[in-house]
UniProtKB/Swiss-Prot annotation:
PANTHER family per record: TRNA MODIFICATION GTPASE GTPBP3, TRNA MODIFICATION GTPASE GTPBP3, MITOCHONDRIAL
Name this polypeptide is given: Uncharacterized protein MJ0920
GO MF, one example: GTP binding
Organism field: Methanocaldococcus jannaschii (strain ATCC 43067 / DSM 2661 / JAL-1 / JCM 10045 / NBRC 100440) (Methanococcus jannaschii)
Domain G per the UniProt entry, residue ranges: 17-137
Length: 185
């Protein structure tokens, strides 16, 4: 019997830290990172590893965990990214459609963009995909800013975010735990 593939697409605006989060999840450099927005154009797919998810000892069930780093659909000023040509946009939405789960990355220093709020609702209700909302760059936020952003995100998209820092690895183990718990449910 062939192991199933469980694909997780990482989405967010340009420079939100999607590639950095992917690198942090892998514990090594697997996706190009740059200060310049639009570095990731075509989706970058990486095999994370095999996870045992079955509970039956005699017939263990495994899943191949795959992460897909997608280019930023929008800029931090809420405009469509210039890298999103029709071909790139089509490939990006193919990957989103084929994914089993979404990690929606919000840049903590910018906040939730209206365009991503709309995309979040589309993914949640039309595609009915599980979505983990991640607020990156939490190392740049004080406790008051974190609380305000958390409340705003919960109110706007009805999803409790987790705070991570791809730079300091804060929250990365918790993100992996959430993914693994979802798979083992």
């Amino acid at each position: 019997m062939q192991d199933k593939e469980f694909k997780i697409a990482i989405i967010g605006p340009e420079n939100a830290g999607k590639s950095s989060i992917m690198n942090a999840l892998f514990g090594k450099y697997v996706s190009l990172v740059s200060e310049v927005g639009g570095t990731t154009k075509m989706p970058i797919k990486r095999y994370w590893g095999k996870l045992k998810i079955g509970r039956i000892k005699e017939e263990p069930e495994f899943v191949n965990l795959v992460f897909v780093d997608l280019g930023g659909l929008y800029t931090t000023t809420d405009k469509q990214s210039p890298i999103m040509t029709p071909k790139v946009l089509e490939k990006t939405f193919e990957e989103i459609n084929d994914s089993d789960m979404i990690i929606h990355v919000i840049d903590g220093s910018v906040g939730l963009l209206r365009s991503f709020e709309r995309l979040h609702h589309l993914l949640k209700f039309r595609y009915q995909k599980p979505i983990i909302v991640v607020i990156n760059k939490c190392d740049l936020l004080n406790d008051s800013d974190k609380e305000h952003l958390k409340n705003y995100v919960e109110r706007r998209i009805k999803n409790t975010p987790i705070f991570v820092s791809a730079k300091t690895f804060e929250g990365i183990p918790e993100l992996l735990d959430i993914i693994i718990k979802y798979l083992k449910r």
